[in-house]
Amino acid sequence: NSYKNKKILITGAGGSIGKELCIQILHLQPKQIILIDNSEYSLYLTNLVLDTLKKSHSYKTNIISLLKSINNSDTMKDTFTRYKPEIVFHAAAYKHVSLVETNPIESIKNNVFGSLNVIKAALYSNVKQFILISTDKAVRPSNVMGATKRLSEIILQSYVSNKIDIEYNIVRFGNVIGSRASVIPLFNYQIKQ
């Protein structure tokens, strides 16, 4: 168990993928999980689930919930400096294709520049492992969301490819059943209509 007694930071902790990562990682009993999300309600729900699991399993993991935006580079740098995570899961992103298409500037700010802020903060604080959660839409992107995620992958690769003291991974998910960006609820809605 390479996560036991480690400090792990998860961006997008209130999202469907981020929340599930938090749950699974808690079962590995890290020393600390630092949750970052810009949605108060989503962060609250994730924290509630983790607190319940922590009590029911008598885990000693320290859970820190931070209502923060990845779009503020100073905030990210300060957060990483203060909590000194060893492992980072970067799951924060705007992912609803139709909304990203109609709000490309905000999506680029969040998915590209926000990712850059997280990557730079991680390198500044000497993170040992960085996992970027991406999408299958980053392969030959045909929409803004796919392009922003592909750019975040390229940025990560360019910043860490020549570093020997950090392990990095990019995980591309397809359509995740049960996630808030899944096409399944849309299909169900259309069938009911």
Range-by-range predicted roles:
Residues 65, 107, 130, 168-171:
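Hydrophobic/aromatic anchor residues within beta-strands of the central parallel beta-sheet
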Residues 71, 138, 176-178:
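Conserved sequence/active-site signature of Rossmann-fold short-chain dehydrogenase/reductase
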Residues 32-39, 81-82, 87, 102-130:
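NAD(P)-cofactor binding segment of oxidoreductase domains
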Residues 98-103, 143-144:
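Conserved catalytic-core motifs of eukaryotic protein kinase domains, centered on the activation segment
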Residues 67, 91-95, 134-136:
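Conserved NAD(P)H cofactor-binding loop of Rossmann-fold oxidoreductase domains
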